[in-house]
Amino acid sequence: AGFAGDDAPRAVFPSIVGRPRHTGVMVGMGQKDAYIGDEAQSKRGILTLKYPIEHGIVSNWDDMEKIWHHTFYNELRVAPEEHPWLLTEAPLNPKANREKMTQIMFETFNVPAMYVAIQAVLSLYASGRTTGIVLDSGDGVSHTVPIYEGYALPHAILRLDLAGRDLTDCLMKILTERGYSFTTSAEREIVRDVKEKLAYVALDYEQELETAKSSSSVEKSYELPDGQVITIGSERFRCPEVLFQPSLVGMEAAGIHETTYNSIMKCDVDIRKDLYGNIVLSGGTTMFPGIADRMSKEITALAPSSMKIKVVAPPERKYSVWIGGSILASLSTFQQ
């Protein structure tokens, strides 16, 4: 969250609501019944953590309202009724979801005006393009969204319920097989950190597995909060490989490369060339080292041989949706 015209968000925190697992015994400690974002993260050892947004769609409106309240009053420290707001939503978001969002903004927070933008379109704005296909992969959901001259092509948008949280789960499973136990919602956050710090995408998965078997070059160690050190090897690339091979976790879905290709093939034959040449990655789950090269390799294999393929991975892609929103909301034409 932040202000239009800024080049980076003022507040970045996870959409988590944490509730105490135990009853408070110290009088006057001012214990709350719910903690939001970073505070929930830091006190996670005694909390049950819940995500009100599942697969990119809000599933718990009371918690979502708490998160918005926290954003306005504690993070940005502005009165919501004094500013117009730009909110974002996942592509193919149910209409009822958008209506509920609008209702809460107007009735609970009394905002003077608001606009709901599609996340992937904003990412494309942030990359300085008006035509391209965006692969947006966050925590709960991935989408491929073809956009031509600023218009999203709804018939060709594809959704894949495979994203950051599934990769964290997958890594939790692999680590459990290795004898490390991560069970609570709080411990899952530790695994997420391991994933963000150490995981990468292999250019050639089979070859990388061979390398990992024969040498210790891929091994890295990670210190857990209690001081115990774990070593992870092939897990580093086995976990993000799920993006390209969902069958590894028993999902009957096409990988992100195939989904991108299928999305392009659903578009008019005349615009495919422009889409192949502007494949833009966005969202936290596209932050793995090596993902752009692998994506380029996989799509080149699927596309016609003469086709020029370009995968763009902007360094700020973790926040490119926000940056695109900042650009859009600061346009005078938009404000009218």
Curated annotation (Swiss-Prot):
Cell compartments where the protein resides: Cytoplasm, Cytoskeleton
PROSITE patterns, per the entry: ACTINS_1, ACTINS_ACT_LIKE
The protein's enzyme class: hydrolase
UniProt cross-references to SUPFAM superfamilies, sorted A to Z: Actin-like ATPase domain
Cellular component terms (Gene Ontology): actin cytoskeleton; cytoplasm
One Pfam family hit: Actin
Entry EC no(s): 3.6.4.-
Bilayer-spanning residue ranges: none
Record's catalysed reaction(s): ATP + H2O = ADP + phosphate + H(+)
Record SMART domains: ACTIN (SM00268)
Keyword entries, A-Z: ATP-binding, Cytoplasm, Cytoskeleton, Hydrolase, Nucleotide-binding
Molecular function GO terms recorded: ATP binding; hydrolase activity
Superkingdom, natural source: Eukaryota
Record InterPro entries: Actin (IPR004000), Actin/actin-like_CS (IPR020902), Actin_CS (IPR004001), ATPase_NBD (IPR043129)
Further information: There are at least 7 different actin genes in tobacco.
Family: Belongs to the actin family.
Function in brief: Actins are highly conserved proteins that are involved in various types of cell motility and are ubiquitously expressed in all eukaryotic cells. Essential component of cell cytoskeleton; plays an important role in cytoplasmic streaming, cell shape determination, cell division, organelle movement and extension growth.
Protein name: Actin-66
